[in-house]
């Protein structure tokens, strides 16, 4: 599969085996929706959620009809279903990127896979912290920063990788044991809290 055709959406289809029967998708309206149509695998159960960030709601009245990520969290975490794969593409701020992983982790089976888009954009312009004034426009923002902070904090007990294609595809396996799952969730909550309180430094690009 060439780099030109290897996208986050096609990667989801590629790794989905007969054992991967369910897919959870959570997207920001401006950054993730087009990828929905790249996923060709036929899942037995597929649930998708689209939200608008507070920034989007404040700058364009059209986005006010979409729920916030907090409202999406309530919807997703009220489901009884558990999923084999979660594919997330957040509004590209660190807070949203951390929160969307937390939401997904709560709804996944042991051994499931989290896939996040825009985790390694090589073009420095795409890594601009500020959102572009006009969409559609290629922008990866600080999602790579959140992914980097997470993976740097993980011990060797956790399985993850970053694929250098389609602006970077982050892949994280949900641990098999309950103790490690709780450890991962505690880490996510700690990173989010430390970033919000200003006690976490932004990593250098590498």
Regions from the PLM with identified roles:
Residues 1-87, 91-206:
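A short alpha-helical cap/connector motif
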């Amino acid at each position: 599969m060439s780099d030109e055709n290897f996208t986050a959406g096609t990667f989801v289809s590629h790794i989905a085996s007969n054992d991967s029967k369910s897919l959870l998708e959570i997207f920001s309206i401006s950054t993730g929706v087009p990828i929905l149509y790249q996923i060709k695998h036929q899942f037995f159960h597929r649930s998708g959620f689209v939200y608008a960030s507070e920034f989007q709601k404040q700058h364009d009245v059209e986005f006010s009809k979409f729920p916030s990520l907090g409202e999406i969290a309530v919807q997703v975490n009220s489901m009884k279903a558990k999923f084999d794969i979660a594919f997330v593409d957040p509004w590209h701020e660190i807070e949203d990127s951390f929160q969307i992983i937390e939401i997904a982790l709560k709804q996944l089976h042991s051994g499931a896979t989290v896939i996040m888009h825009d985790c390694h954009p090589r073009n420095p312009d795409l890594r601009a912290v500020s959102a572009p004034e006009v969409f559609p426009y290629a922008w990866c923002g600080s999602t790579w920063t959140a992914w980097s902070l997470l993976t740097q904090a993980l011990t060797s007990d956790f399985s993850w990788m970053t694929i250098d294609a389609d602006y970077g595809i982050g892949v994280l396996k949900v641990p098999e044991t309950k103790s490690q799952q709780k450890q991962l969730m505690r880490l996510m909550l700690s990173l989010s809290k430390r970033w919000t309180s200003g006690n976490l430094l932004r990593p250098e690009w590498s």
